[in-house]
């Protein structure tokens, strides 16, 4: 059984149907370097034709994906972290140091990636995902999503909104 995907090539004015043979639940999608990457419960997909067709690249369980500095990074359950620096054609498993936590969100900004997860977990990489370090925060609630804009990182989760105290993402505080 195949799933249906919808795509637009005119900024959302009209939509066309494409297909993929995948039936997974997908949680994250991002775009970079003329490539879309979508990921979810059991697959990581790639499209280089604006979403008309999708190819399964690998079978992993990930929740979110971000692109920056010519690198795609996906994060998921049990601290899973995967990186790709060849437009999503191959992926490398990385040690996030967060194996006791699920990582639900990831973003890129100011030449670094920030990922957030269960029990208030915040981690940062300044080398395109090769290594990760903890970020200072007093939050213990799960964090579900993170974004970068206007020179700060903002993360949200269970009854929580926090922001970085500067553009490096080294320390977060409740807002």
Segments predicted by a language model, with ranges:
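Residue-level hotspots at or immediately adjacent to binding/recognition sites across diverse folds
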Residues: 1-175
């Amino acid at each position: 059984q195949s799933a249906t995907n919808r795509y637009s090539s005119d900024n959302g004015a009209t939509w066309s149907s494409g297909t993929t043979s995948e039936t997974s639940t997908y949680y994250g999608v991002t775009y970079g370097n003329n490539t879309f990457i979508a990921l979810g419960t059991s697959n990581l997909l790639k499209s280089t034709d604006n979403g008309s067709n999708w190819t399964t690249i690998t079978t992993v369980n990930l929740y979110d994906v971000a692109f920056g500095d010519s690198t795609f990074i996906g994060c998921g359950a049990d601290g899973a972290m995967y990186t790709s620096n060849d437009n999503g054609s191959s992926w490398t498993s990385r040690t996030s140091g967060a194996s006791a936590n699920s990582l639900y969100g990831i973003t890129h900004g100011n030449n670094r990636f920030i990922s957030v997860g269960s029990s208030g977990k915040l981690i940062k990489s300044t080398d395109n995902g090769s290594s990760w370090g903890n970020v200072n925060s007093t939050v213990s609630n799960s964090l579900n999503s993170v974004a970068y804009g206007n020179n700060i990182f903002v993360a949200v989760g269970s009854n929580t909104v926090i922001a970085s105290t500067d553009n490096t993402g080294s320390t977060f505080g409740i807002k």
